[in-house]
Each structure stands twice: as C-alpha cells, then as structure tokens.
C-alpha cells in the first residue's frame, strides 16, 4: 500500500517523507515522527541543533531528544545528522549515553556539518544580554545556535570532518577560539580542557563522520524508506519567519535539500504538523495571542513549557492565514492536527480566518502573511466563532466519535487550508491518534 493512502503501517518501498512544523514550533511533531520512524529505514535531521526538542515515550520510558532523530530508538533504523546542522558534541554524547546500548553504530554525521563549541553558547548569552539592555531581546535558547551559524556563514567555522584529523582540527580550533575570545572580550575560557574532550570525541566518532550526500543518494537508489525530521518550524525560518524573532537556519522544505544534499524530486510527501491552537516561545509578534484566562488555561492544560528551555509558552488562537502562507512555502500535502483534546472544556473557540488592515480596512490577500515586526500595529485578526465542547475526547478512536462541535472545528480548518487532515491528536500517548479517512 502506498503512503499516499495514509496507511502508516504499510509504507511502500522508496518513500521519502518529510515532517515539518507549520507554526512556531512545539506543534507536537515528535509523536507522528515516532510513529513513522518505526516503519522507515533511515531517519534524518537537516537543520538546527540542540535548540529543538522531542519527548518520546517507548515502552513506558521517556526519552528527551534534542539532536538525535527519533528513529534512534528503533533497532532497525539508521539515523543521519545532515550538513545543515550545527552539532554540540558534548550534548550529542550525553544523549547517546542516556539512551544506552550500541546506538552509535546506527548513527552517521555529515562531515560538512559545523561544530558548535561552548564558546558559541557564551557568545549567545553575551549577545542576548546586550539586546535585553537595548529592549530588543530575541528570546533565544542560548544554546549557541546563532553564533555557530554566524561563524559558518563568515567562513571561519569548523566542520565536523576536520575532527577526523585531530592535529589539523587542533590548529583550526585554537585559531577560531583565540579570535572569538578577542572579538567578544572573553577572558576566561578553558581551551585545554575542551581540547581534551574533543580528542575523546575524535576517537569515538571518527568512523561515524561520513560524506552524507553520497550516503543518502546511495540509499535513495536502493529504494530505502527515508523519514526527514524537521526541527523548529516554518515561522521560525531565517528567511520566511517573523524576522528577527527567528532561528538561524532554514526550517522550511528548502532546507531539506540544502541540509541533506538530496534531490528535490525525490521527496514524495510533506506532512505539515499543526497544533489545534497556537503557541510561541520567546519574543516577537503574535497577533492571536491570548493574554487572559483562556491563554492560561491552554498553557496549563496543554503543558505548554519548552522542552529545551522550560520557558512558559505564549498561547493563542489558531491562525489560518499563517497556515496558508506556510502551505505556499512548504507545499504541504497532508496535515497532522495535534492536541485537539486541549480545547475540550472551552465554551467557545475562535479561529483566525483573515487579517484586516487597520489603515484601509482591506483584507490581506490569501497566501500573504504579515511577518514584519510591526505587523500588530498595522493588522487586526478576523475571527470565526465556534461552539466548544465539554467531553473528554482522549478515548475517541474515530473521527465520528468526536463531539459534533469538535468535528465542525476540524472540518473548518481543513476547508480553509484546503489540505486533508489525516491524523488528529486527542491525547499525549501514541495511541491517542485518530486516523481520519
């Protein structure tokens, strides 16, 4: 059976499937990634670093993953970290050790990905503190992601492939660290201790660092099932997101091809993951935000606290213009709607279906989205109102078992976005997922 028939238990050979966040992250991508990882041969990441996070439950044990793809939890799965990533090796080794077993034998790292050093994290904190004093805080995770991509783009960063020859790596390392210490006036930094750690990483990982481009394209020729796991989400994309309140990598579909080196024609299916309401961590415009008791209700019921930072997430109503904008960019084929159960108990639910200019009164054109920093000053959301439901829906197994008002809400989203909603999350566990025919 073909995956286009949406039977996740029966993937046909040679499928390349991408799972991408369609909002500001934290959509609940981990669950569907975990479900599909069991049926794939290779699971890949193509962007970001340890600023992403999934919490996956397998056999009643929870795993917090920030760098490793979810497929690492399944013995039949090969996992790949692509060249578009920035890798903090200490964090990676800690994740590997937390899972245990011989999982490193199933892990490959691109020789073209960049190494994220502790000094990048130090610089991240310095930059964020400066912006805070200026009232221009971005709200980064302070994991060093932006500074590492900065050294990459400035052509002074160090690729993971350099670690295979340790003496060569050592020379590059000392030059980079000395330059960054001088540039940011960092007085206290233990280079010797970090170099000792990197020698251990060299011994442990030298055979796992490969030419991922060749590896991936050979696997494609072998008709392997490949699952591509997006980190962060479309509205945090460095180009398409709400700049400057974005991450530093390409989080949209184009990042797959530049971050893994695979042919764009090989991608069979793009799954857009959409939370039933909207959340955001950190600063930046959020035009459907609920700074009231409803927002607090969603935060507590949905456990909306960051996997990586533990920061409380801002909550608001679902934004259809945002989804249409993201659909244009990512060419979403089907939707996984998550956390519908969190809306249970609300008397009414609002759905943002458009934006009206505060100046002219005109509606924003379909497919456009106001991503600029001053968007809330220029546009106001247009809402459609839906009646809520009181029932606990976590035990619903079919779409028809959902309360009528819940069905109406889901169908309205499907109508406005014009993409089929195939999976609906109605609870935190893997089996709390409805497949909508």
From Swiss-Prot:
SUPFAM superfamilies: P-loop containing nucleoside triphosphate hydrolases. NCBIfam families: PRK01117.1 (NF002223), purA (TIGR00184). Binds 1 Mg(2+) ion per subunit. GO terms for molecular function: adenylosuccinate synthase activity; GTP binding; magnesium ion binding. GO terms for cellular component: cytoplasm. Keywords: Cytoplasm, GTP-binding, Ligase, Magnesium, Metal-binding, Nucleotide-binding, Purine biosynthesis. Its EC number is 6.3.4.4. The active site is at 26 (proton acceptor), 54 (proton donor). InterPro entries: Adenylosuccin_syn_GTP-bd (IPR018220), Adenylosuccin_syn_Lys_AS (IPR033128), Adenylosuccinate_synth_dom1 (IPR042109), Adenylosuccinate_synth_dom2 (IPR042110), Adenylosuccinate_synth_dom3 (IPR042111), Adenylosuccinate_synthetase (IPR001114), P-loop_NTPase (IPR027417). Belongs to the adenylosuccinate synthetase family. It comes from Plasmodium knowlesi (strain H). This is Adenylosuccinate synthetase. Gene3D superfamilies: Adenylosuccinate Synthetase, subunit A, domain 1 (3.40.440.10), Adenylosuccinate Synthetase, subunit A, domain 2 (1.10.300.10), Adenylosuccinate Synthetase, subunit A, domain 3 (3.90.170.10). Substrate binds at residues 307-313. It is an enzyme of class 6 (ligase). It is found in: Cytoplasm. Its cofactor is Mg(2+).
